């Protein structure tokens, strides 16, 4: 949301008090990537999740491929429950920016493994195929990794 959206909200509300007026802190950020004025979702997600710019295609890492800590990690350290709830796959760039650290956004198996190794409280979304043994280069079922870490894996909407 940009400043023009906030201005439109103020007009719509007849200049009454809005949530923006009640907020203790607000920020204006730019999410263009470190290597391009036109960002992709991996770089934009990383900027939002970690407070750092990175290159297009990079996920949860700085331009030199060093892992960038996310606000999700801050919340986990503070003992807060955390989660990722998406209509895309959980391994997609935007949700992945909050828990994964890979130099290339399409490293879906590595992202899936990092999801399984994360301390998220809940993760809802697609991407089961990246955890199935038949789809993995190592042949190891990632679903078992998720279950071993205490995740309850649901594969049917009736569950």
Task: Show where each model-derived region lies.
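N-terminal catalytic scaffold of extracellular/periplasmic and nuclease hydrolases
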Residues: 1-158
């Amino acid at each position: 949301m940009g400043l023009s959206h906030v201005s439109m909200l103020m007009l719509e509300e007849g200049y009454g008090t809005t949530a923006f007026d009640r907020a203790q802190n607000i920020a204006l950020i730019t999410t263009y990537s470190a290597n391009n004025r036109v960002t992709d979702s991996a770089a934009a997600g990383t900027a939002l999740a970690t407070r750092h710019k990175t290159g297009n295609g990079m996920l949860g890492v700085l331009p030199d491929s060093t892992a960038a800590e996310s606000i999700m990690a801050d919340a986990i350290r503070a003992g807060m429950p955390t989660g990722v709830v998406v209509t895309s796959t959980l391994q997609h760039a935007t949700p992945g920016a909050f828990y994964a650290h890979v130099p290339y956004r399409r490293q879906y198996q590595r992202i899936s493994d990092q999801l399984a190794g994360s301390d998220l409280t809940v993760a809802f979304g697609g991407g089961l195929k990246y955890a199935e043994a038949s789809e993995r280069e190592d042949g190891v079922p990632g679903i078992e990794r998720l279950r071993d870490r205490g995740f309850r894996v649901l594969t049917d909407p009736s569950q």
